Amino acid sequence: MNTRNNLQVEGFFDPATWTVSYIVFDRKTQVCALIDSVLDYDPKSGRTSHGSADRLIERVRELGAKVQWILETHVHADHLSAAPYLKQALGGKLGIGQHITTVQKAFGSLFNAGSNFADDGRQFDQLFADGEAFEIGSLKAIAIHTPGHTPGHTPACMTYVVSDDKAAAADSAAFVGDTLFMPDYGTARCDFPGGDARTLYRSINKVLSLSPATRLYMCHDYQPGGRDVQFVSTVAEEREKNVHARNGISEEEFVAMRNARDVTLGMPTLILPSVQVNMRAGQLPEPEANGTRYIKIPLNAV
């Protein structure tokens, strides 16, 4: 837990998907945002459960907090979002980047989602534009478009920068989604449909142009070498030490490295169920005539 001035950040690590979910809490107003939640999913049985989300709910209630926002940094391809479950339990507005609509169009077509699937973003309460300001209680926040990694031809990837209005830059926090990882692991892959290494490099530079003391909160930690979980870095640390994107690595070098590395990677285990659910803001597909919901597996299409 990081607590500075009115801004308090708590991370919750899910070892099954290597995902970190966050509570961003304004101690002054007792208001919070939840970022990148996880719906537990067993791909062998097709069963969902709520252990990870219930940890967030329990902690929010311990804090006595009111949920103002449930935020997604992007349409995740490696875990399912628990946003609807959290919203039902705690309230709050669901937000993502405005380019979710292009993601929905692309993947609605891939999964043949049908006419009942809305591809205009209406499943979300707020579609953030690049540079759009908003508040979490008395905390100031800004949404920055940081595409390059996620599926979709104009990805909905966002970085959310949050600060106490009266605090120094060292008290700012940026939730970077899958742009950067901890310095010893590097950066996100770019080989999903619509991903692009050159675009990601430029997005990373947006993040690394923030104040050097800005704390960066990762969406994942893959524990290279079996080390303990780590998910907080700073702009300065990433500039100095990131194995893929430190100072001195050119755009051309990054693109060549990223493209060469990505061709060696298999698809994430949960990419097909994740994208189908997350393009719907975490809602499961509608039940069919027999009352059962289904995840589709498009053959030879991804």
Describe the role of every protein-language-model region:
Residues 47, 106-109, 187-188, 227-232:
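Short aromatic-enriched loop/helix-cap "lid" or pocket-rim segments at secondary-structure transitions
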Residues 1-8, 99, 195, 202-215, ...:
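Accessory terminal helices/loops
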Residues 77, 103-104, 226:
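Generic structural signal for helix capping and beta-alpha/helix-loop junctions
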Residues 88, 110-117, 194, 234-235:
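Short, hinge-like loop/turn segments at secondary-structure boundaries
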Residues 94-124, 261:
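Acidic/polar short surface loop at catalytic or gating sites that assists cofactor/ion binding
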Residues 1-67, 117-221, 299-302:
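Catalytic core of the metallo-beta-lactamase
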Residues 81-83, 159-160, 185, 227:
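Active-site-flanking alpha-helical
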Residues 46-95:
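Active-site metal-binding motif and surrounding structural segment of the metallo-beta-lactamase
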